Curated annotation (Swiss-Prot):
Biological source species: Listeria monocytogenes serotype 4a (strain HCC23)
Gene Ontology biological-process entries: DNA-templated transcription
One example GO MF annotation: DNA binding
Region Disordered, annotated ranges: 1160-1184
E.C. designation(s): 2.7.7.6
Similarity section: Belongs to the RNA polymerase beta chain family.
Catalytic activity field: RNA(n) + a ribonucleoside 5'-triphosphate = RNA(n+1) + diphosphate
Name of protein: DNA-directed RNA polymerase subunit beta
Length: 1184
């Protein structure tokens, strides 16, 4: 197939790309953060009302008072989004609820509106602002409520079955077989009972009733033999003893216990999704498919025969009788006696012959279409689920795969919030009931009954500390977008890392088009945290749906009609791939088409195809769809590529890739990092911080101008990860803009496209071994021209509190600090904006009162004369930590007097923002988009870099050995196509699974006038001689990752010590030392390096006296004294003594060595000598 030259596609206002796509897309990508916004909107519109409806009315124990929830409304938020961030507040709106209190004795009605706390609002970008920080609520993947059947082998290898009825909340019902072919039931994880006990308790007391109901079979006979009860009352008592062991059982108690466990909507909730799944599973049609009828089916109304005995129900026959099934064929009304429920039970029952035995009849029982709004389980559900279990034992029916996405659903923001709110409301309900019984009924008002504390607390707890409420990843727009589309199987009610096996983590065929098979973290969470595929949507039940183009069964044409299918609906259809060839009419050109049916990939006759994929990229997530030539990369490397793009640091001068995939525009627009137009209009005014757009609308075919929309751009703000969040205008005055168009680029954006890195000239070659093990050699040009320079903003804060000895004070007047150190502080002791600061410089001068000592008479006299301060103060100023130098960007001051909300005990809070400009540096980590990552090992002068025949030096040298074994060939194709694109002055788009193939790349290379093999001769920059072989040189898109050497570099001279062991702390955060561990000690022992070893184990570590003396000796230039006894040895002896052993330390001549107990004085002296801080909390003691 020869390469086609591609066609031009416009992405936004400023960018045209040559696209190599062959498949025309029928469906636009949906709004990528819809999963967040739609779910929260549902919560505001429906979810809240649903909850108030569930809990209303609240009645007191006597039934005299009743409190009803009438209506609710959300007010205006107290602060805007920006202001909430600045003030460390929540972006929230007051929730007011209208209540009605009815006094049933007097008939008096009181209405009142009650404030129920501030409710956090979602911003337009799909995030929440909690305490000034942007957070995202991640959607959770959980097992859907419903009834599940699974096959299992016992220890003898005999096949048995298990089944579970899982509610949304409430008691579980589990059925299982044992080695003796007895069917047992467990109620709510208690000891097992024969299943017939449960049936008797439902009111089918005698053996004969049970046999008539379920149908005669060996399993049932075995179970009845094992069953000790013989009527409903005994069965009820038996169940009560299991559920409430040790309590005296009575029949009435047992009845009410079972009713409250299963049939009370407040205690047992299937949710609408559970009801839907149970009705679907227990429907007769799946069990009747391809079975032989053992009775004649007659329409109950007309009396006509629908199907006769001995008919085989294939797909066609079954489709014909399904409407009759729904009209009541086979309905039986059961009249239970003495059971839990008095009412009759309606089931649907049909007899068939056993699949492996034509003589044997089997009863199939369904639950006869229970209404959607019945959210608790019913007796007919229990009977039909038991019937299904017996059917399974005879080979009728299917077991379920719990990893199938038809059985796993998403709990998104709205539902998670609703569950949390429900917990708060039910706690409140208890309080209301208590208050109703205590207070005077005549004067009481709704306001006095309600206590909003539990509701507010449960919402606060959810946003503040739930596993699913996460600090937003704001490194770059792609990280932000991916975080909002993340699906986690962890969290409350989900799995735990330790318990999750391989099956749950694995890719499943039902993930196709719903969850990305590639993007997931490496490490312990692999497969438990996933990403939503690009076209996927979530339906009202929380199942993920993916779009398919419908194939018209009459004409076999692929239509543009789109159906969204869930995973279990898709199981019934044959689906063709998106790249199947079609002619102009939309029919398949080939007789046999590659298609999927469930887990199979088959070649199918074109007439059998029901649906076709909408797009090749519907399989993968947004981040994965940004990798060009994904189809040429190994999946493990593609995973790393997708994950590393999210860690790209926004650069000072971003540049969109020459070789893109066409996803760059959409993902940048939907991420929320760009400024987008809210209405059509004309740009009137553009400046760095503001864009004005005059609205324009069409009325009766005429243009009408409206008001002005003002968009403010955020300049140089610190993101959650300390990168620089900066927006720049993308339009000019006079431009016409349409709704949704990008007006301002966010961080890592260029001309309205995602721009995570830079296009650089790359050669695949070695150079003196400096790129061994994936290391990267770089030209100094990239440093000089600020190609990979990024801006980082760090925030430091200092608060003045009230202490027991008096308030702390922010001041310039600091003890023992020279004027030189204070030169950049203003009169309040706060650093000025624009000052350049280095390690250990003062940012905020602050003093804390020390304890006042008794003064001598002379001192008192002096103080009286000179008015000296008698109080002693200690310097507790905020200083720049190691490696934190830079330029002061901004200072924010919050005080009580100015009316700022501060935590209790804090009088003043100062925040200082320091900005750093970081150029690329040896030790920084870089990567391409194909999982090809490496650390910069050497930055060479431009003149030493290899250069091309026209004299251009290359920018980066990568090791060619990094390609073959990693199998990410995509980077080589990108290299050549990028070179051609640069030569032609174009940008190209090569969408995943439908992009440029090898021929396209070669034809573009030829068009650009490059050599046929796309390689070139390179000359050594040092000697000017040509290298032996031709070398692949091209343009690759490389990104700088957030793992920067400046954040990791760390050195300690002396510093804090752990309190008990007196050993140095570890880690950069604690200013710790390097651990010299067990194995390192062995290495020194092997060389017999006794003195080195001794000083490492004593004076460099925990010989308290020795290290102080050593420090003094070094300062004075004397020789280092003999080491003493390490503190850890003393700790060991103290531990032995505390166990009651008499252990003494003896010297060489058997003299006892006195162990000196450390006093507080020693600590202070030592601290002065070392200028160190004693860690006051045990958390700082990072012990191994």
């Amino acid at each position: 197939m020869s390469g086609h030259s591609g066609h031009d596609v416009k992405y936004g206002r400023h960018r045209t790309r040559r696209s190599f796509a062959r498949i025309s897309e029928v469906l636009e990508l949906p709004n990528l953060i819809e999963i967040q916004t739609a779910s929260y909107q549902w919560f505001l519109d429906e979810g809240l009302r649903e909850m108030f409806r569930d809990i209303s009315p609240i009645e007191d124990f006597a039934g005299n008072l009743s409190l009803e929830f009438i209506d609710y409304d959300l007010g205006e938020p107290k602060y805007s989004v920006e202001e909430s961030k600045n003030r460390d507040a929540n972006y929230a709106a007051p929730l007011r609820v209208k209540l009605r209190l009815i006094n049933k004795e007097t008939g008096e009605v009181k209405d009142q509106e009650v404030f129920m706390g501030d409710f956090p609002l979602m911003t337009e970008m799909g995030t929440f602002i909690i305490n000034g920080a942007e957070r995202v609520i991640v959607s959770q993947l959980v097992r859907s409520p419903g009834v599940y059947f699974n096959g299992k082998l016992d220890k003898n290898g005999k096949k048995g079955f298990g089944s579970t009825v899982i509610p949304n909340r409430g008691a579980w019902l589990e059925y299982e077989t044992d080695a003796k072919d007895v069917v047992h039931v467990r109620i709510d994880r208690t000891r097992k009972l024969p299943v017939t006990v449960l049936l008797r308790a439902l009111g089918f007391g005698s053996d004969q009733e049970i046999i008539d109901l379920i149908g005669d079979n060996d399993y049932l006979r075995n179970t009845l033999e094992k069953d000790n009860t013989d009527n409903a009352e005994k069965a009820l008592l038996e169940i009560y003893e299991r559920l409430r062991p040790g309590e005296p059982p009575t029949v009435d108690n047992a009845r009410s216990l079972l009713v409250s466990r299963f049939f009370d909507p407040k205690r047992y909730d299937l949710a609408s999704v559970g009801r839907y799944k149970i009705n679907k599973k227990l429907h007769l049609k799946n069990r009747l498919f391809n079975q032989t009828l053992a009775e004649t089916l007659v329409d109950p109304e007309t009396g006509e025969i629908i199907a006769s005995k001995g008919d085989i129900l294939d797909r066609r026959n079954l489709d014909q009788i399904i409407p009759n099934l729904e009209n009541g064929v086979g309905f039986r009304t059961l009249r239970p006696t003495d059971g839990v429920m008095e009412d009759s039970v309606l089931v649907q029952s049909i007899k068939i012959y056993a699949p492996n035995d034509d003589e044997k009849e089997i009863n199939i029982i369904g639950n006869a279409y229970i209404e959607e709004n019945v959210k608790h389980i019913t007796p007919s559900d229990i009977i039909s689920s038991i019937s299904y279990f017996f059917n399974l034992l005879h080979g009728v029916g299917d077991t379920d795969d719990i990893d199938h996405l038809g059985n796993r659903r998403l709990r998104s923001v709205g539902e998670l919030l609703q569950n949390q709110f429900r917990i708060g409301l039910s706690r409140m309900e208890r309080v209301v009931r208590e208050r109703m019984s205590i207070q005077d009924m005549t004067t009481i008002t709704p306001q006095q009954l309600i206590n909003i504390r539990p509701v507010v607390a449960s919402i606060k707890e959810f946003f503040g500390s739930s596993q699913l409420s996460q600090f937003m990843d704001q490194t770059n727009p792609l990280g932000e977008l991916t975080h909002k589309r993340r699906l986690s199987a962890l969290g409350p009610g989900g799995l735990t890392r330790e318990r999750a096996g391989y099956e749950v983590r694995d890719v499943h065929y039902s993930h196709y088009g719903r969850m990305c098979p590639i993007e997931t973290p490496e490490g312990p969470n692999i497969g438990l945290i996933n990403s939503l595929s690009s076209f996927a949507k979530v339906n009202k039940f929380g199942f993920i749906e993916t779009p398919y183009r419908r194939v018209d069964p009459e004409t076999n044409r692929v239509t543009d009609k789109i159906d969204y299918l869930t995973a279990d609906e898709e199981d019934n259809y044959v689906v063709a791939q998106a790249n199947s060839k079609l002619d102009e009419q939309g029919t398949f050109t080939e007789e046999e088409v590659m298609a999927r049916f469930r887990s199979e990939n088959l070649a199918v006759e074109k007439e059998r195809i029901d649906y076709m994929d909408v797009s090749p990229k519907q399989v993968v997530s947004v981040a994965t769809a940004c990798i060009p030539f994904l189809e040429n990369d190994d999946s493990n490397r593609a995973l790393m590529g997708a994950n590393m793009q999210r860690q790209a640091v926004p650069l000072m001068h971003p540049e969109a890739p020459f070789v893109g995939t066409g996803m760059e525009h959409v993902s940048a627009k939907d991420s929320g990092a760009a400024v987008t137009a809210k209405h059509d209009g004309i740009v009137e005014h553009v400046e760095a911080r503001e864009i004005w757009v005059r609205r324009v609308s069409l009325v009766d075919g005429k243009e009408v101008t409206g008001g002005i929309d003002k968009y403010t751009l955020r300049k140089f703000v610190r993101s959650n990860q300390g990168t620089c969040y900066n927006q720049r205008p993308n339009v000019a005055e006079g431009d016409r803009v349409v709704k949704g168009e990008i007006l301002g680029n966010g961080p890592s954006m260029d001309s309205g496209e995602l721009a995570l890195g830079r296009n650089v000239l790359v050669a695949f070659m070695t150079w003196d071994g400096y790129n061994y093990e994936d290391a990267i050699i770089m030209s100094e040009r990239l440093v000089k021209d600020d190609v990979y320079t990024s801006i980082h903003i760090e925030e430091f804060e200092s608060e003045a509190r009230d202490t027991k000895l008096g308030p702390e004070e922010m001041t310039r007047d600091i003890p023992n600090v020279g004027e030189d150190a204070l030169r950049d502080l203003d009169e309040r002791g706060i650093i000025r904006v624009g000052a350049e600061v280095k390690d250990n410089d003062l940012l905020v001068g602050k003093v804390t009162p020390k304890g006042v000592t008794e003064l001598t008479a002379e001192e008192r006299l002096l103080h009286a004369i000179f008015g000296e301060k008698a109080r002693e103060v200690r310097d507790t100023s905020l200083r720049v930590p190691h490696g934190g130098g830079g330029i002061v960007l901004d200072v924010k001051i919050f005080t009580r007097e100015a009316g700022d909300e501060l935590p209790p005990g804090v009088n003043q809070l100062v925040r200082v923002y320091i900005v750093q400009k970081r150029k690329i540096h040896e030790g920084d980590k870089m990567a391409g988009r194909h999982g090809n990552k490496g650390v910069i090992s050497r930055i060479l002068p431009e003149e030493d870099m290899p250069f091309m025949p026209d004299g251009t030096p290359v920018d980066i040298m990568l090791n060619p050995l990094g390609v073959p074994s990693r199998m990410n060939i995509g980077q080589v194709l990108e290299l050549h196509l990028g070179m051609a694109a640069r030569a032609l002055g174009i940008h190209v788009a090569t969408p995943v699974f439908d992009g440029a193939n090898e021929e396209d790349v070669w034809s573009t290379v030829e068009e650009a006038g490059m050599a046929r093999d796309a390689k070139t001769i390179l000359y050594d920059g040092r000697s000017g001689e040509a290298f032996d072989n031709r070398i692949s040189v091209g343009v690759m898109y490389m990104i700088k990752l957030a793992h920067m050497v400046d954040d990791k570099l760390h050195a300690r001279s002396t510093g804090p010590y752990s309190l008990v062991t007196q050993q140095p702390l570890g880690g950069k955060a604690q200013f710790g030392g390097q651990r010299f561990g067990e194995m390192e000690v062995w290495a020194l022992e092997a060389y017999g390096a006794a003195y080195t070893l001794q000083e490492i184990l004593t004076i460099k570590s925990d010989d308290v006296v020795g290290r102080v003396k050593t420090y003094e000796a070094i300062v004075k230039g004397e020789s280092v004294p003999e080491p003493g006894v390490p503190e850890s040895f003393k700790v060991l002896i103290k531990e032995l003594q505390s166990l009651g052993m008499d252990v003494k330390m003896l010297s060489a001549d058997e003299e006892e060595i006195e162990m000196r107990d450390m006093d507080d004085d020693d600590f202070t002296n030592q601290n002065d000598a070392f200028n160190i801080v004693q860690p006051e909390n045990a958390a700082a003691e990072k012990t191994e």
